[in-house]
Amino acid sequence: MKKILTEIHLLMERADLVYIADEIVKHYNLPTKVKFSKSFKRKNNNDKGTYDWENDTIFIKPQGYKTVKDFIETLLHEIHHATRVHRYGLKKFLKKYAQAGQVADYLGKDRYFANKWERKAEGWAQHEYKRYFKDKFFDV
C-alpha cells in the first residue's frame, strides 16, 4: 500500500510540475518545448536541467527539487538560454557562449561555472522568480 501511495504522490507531483512549466513558458511567449527526463545527453549527472538549442527544448529532471522555488529557478535558468537563442539566433549565441567558455579556460576557471552566460542565466532566474513567480506557485 505504501508503495502505491508513493507512486500516486510522485505522479501528482509530476503533473503539478508539468502545469507549472507550461504556465511559465507561456509567460515568456516562447515556442520552446519542455520535456521531463531522468538523464541528459550532455553535461554531468548533477544537472537539474539543460537546454537543447538545436531542438529548442528544455529538459528538466522530474524529481530531486527541495522546493517548488528550486524547480522554478531551474526552469527559468534554462528559459534564459532559450530567450537568448531566440534573440541572437542560434549561430550567434553559440559563438558568444563558446567565447565565454574560452575566456574561462584562459583564466584557469571552469568552462561552465565561470561562463558569463551561465552566471547571467542564474541571476536572471533568481530575479524573475522574485518578480513574477514567488507568490504564484506555493510549496506544500
Locations of the language-model features?
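Zn2+-dependent metallopeptidase catalytic core
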Residues: 12-32
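Post-HEXXH active-site segment of zinc metalloproteases
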Residues: 69-70, 85-119
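Proteolytic processing junctions in secreted/extracellular precursors
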Residues: 2-13
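Active-site recognition of the HExxH zinc-binding catalytic motif
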Residues: 73-86, 121
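OB-fold/S1-family RNA-binding modules
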Residues: 49-53
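Short pre-active-site segment immediately N-terminal to the catalytic Zn-binding motif
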Residues: 58-75
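Soluble non-cytosolic domains of exported or imported proteins
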Residues: 11, 15, 69-70, 74, ...
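Long, well-structured alpha-helical subdomains associated
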Residues: 106-140
